[in-house]
């Protein structure tokens, strides 16, 4: 994952901007970059996945110099989109998905988002029109938050990053608190703070003169359900299994595109076991499997590492078990809470699995 922050029209000094950007270092340890012009700041922390060369660092400027991009995510069909650009005489300088997004936008404008297959959040600054374009993937896998005050707008990958700019009010949203205490998480687009909202999944916005001038839903997941409801047909269990298997296999195969080693979080549950099986059948690369095991459950039926070890052996994966003691948890709790951008009852297992992978 990467992280970015974009300030549009606020009285933000460069030191406060850099301090906020540094907060994103855990999201992007490989490089840092800043582009600025008058009261416009774009900052990025990169985790390199495709084209590990410095030429793919961000913020990235388009070939025509008109557009500046910061981006978090992965575009799994970027190679076919790259070919499309080359076929249109675009002289690309990198092999990254970042440049593909940037030049596709320069070529086709906002409608290009419908061609992207993957998880993403990005902001593009148009130096000619003096406006920003921000978009988020259909499922909201990658975060994008928008903070506002009377003078302008700041966008960032994390809520805490926005607060560190000292430009956004910390007044809390009572409805968000109600959501957390009842559900264990906050329902988007709300956040814990009144003046910070998430960009909705499958939406894009245009921002000019410190204000959102248009908001568009470019992908509506509910239409998939409506389509399925209209086209009801009885199928056998065997046919159903085949459809699910083909769809899952197709999705997992798309995720195997990478210029860095591939790993899997293996919990021994049905879902991660299925993914492990599909991965092992569709790549010759060495796959690393990581399982988190808690000391209190060791040796019991709740110890997932026992089954996970057998699954990893079955699929020929290099297996790493990360054991967590009660003392480990007590020591790590402050860092876990710091990494937790919004209140939630979930995420501890993923935090430890990510720590093991790092």
What is each stretch, according to the model?
Residues 1-341, 350, 354:
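Cysteine-centered catalytic environments shared across enzyme families
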Residues 356-358:
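Active-site nucleotide-sugar/metal-binding loop of Leloir-type enzymes
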Residues 345-346:
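Catalytic subdomain that performs nucleotidyl-dependent activation
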